[in-house]
Amino acid sequence: MNPEATELLLAGAQELGLDVAPVLDQFAALLVLLQEGNARFNLTALKTERDIVLKHFVDSLTCLGGGHLDGNHQVVDLGTGAGFPTLPLALMRAELQFTPVDSTRKKVEFVRATAEALGLQNVRPVAGRAETLTRQPEHRDRYDRVVVRAVAALPILAELALPFLRPGGLLVAQKGPISPEELRAGQRAAGELGGRVTEVEAFTLPVLGDARTLVVVEKLRDTPDRYPRREGVPNQQPLFWSAK
């Protein structure tokens, strides 16, 4: 990691109230592994050290605000891609147990190999789609938290994520700006799925100043058995939402 990227990581984390110095070497190793993997598998569109540090590492750490991940939780990372936010979070929170999920097997294998290379004992990747995995007893109603960095509309995220959670669990969704219409649809969808939106926090990404929104959904009761709908339907026909 070059000196500029190192300073950006330290400064970005400090702005979030976090100290990455104890795991700085592991973050540097993660950056190298990501660049090497990207050359082979095209894992992410971000190529420069600056972009990776700010838009992957620091952005992933923003969900640690608010104490939503404090404690010894079982955490699903829905649509982890190249391992974000799982890998930065796992470096910072050894007490959390992560199950990063992605439908692309090469990405899941990359996350598994990278976690092993970094010596992380708290990462167990799974290949599959949420619609299928949450029909399996080992995944439905089993987790304390779901984290997701997504551009998908909130009703879609709610339908895919809430079935993973046991009652009392939280969906922590890292999104860009969210419209009032999307939020209303997300609130209705959450209610239909056994949850409720408890927090919507607008903030800016450290250093870059990009607009972000953290949405927290609490699961209050079991999700009806009819959800999630079959593969692809939540994305094609989101609950209570028709994007203009």
Swiss-Prot record:
Subcellular location: Cytoplasm
Record's GO cellular component terms: cytosol
InterPro entries associated with the record: rRNA_ssu_MeTfrase_G (IPR003682), SAM-dependent_MTases_sf (IPR029063)
EC number(s) recorded for this UniProt protein: 2.1.1.-
Residues annotated to bind S-adenosyl-L-methionine: 79, 84, 102-104, 130-131, 149
UniProt feature coiled coil, ranges: none
Family: Belongs to the methyltransferase superfamily. RNA methyltransferase RsmG family.
Gene Ontology MF terms in the entry: rRNA (guanine-N7-)-methyltransferase activity
Function: Specifically methylates the N7 position of a guanine in 16S rRNA.
Protein name: Ribosomal RNA small subunit methyltransferase G
PANTHER family: S-ADENOSYL-L-METHIONINE-DEPENDENT METHYLTRANSFERASES SUPERFAMILY PROTEIN
Polar residues composition bias: residue spans: 234-244
Matching Gene3D superfamilies: Vaccinia Virus protein VP39
Keywords linked to the UniProt accession: Cytoplasm, Methyltransferase, rRNA processing, S-adenosyl-L-methionine, Transferase
Region feature (Disordered): 225-244
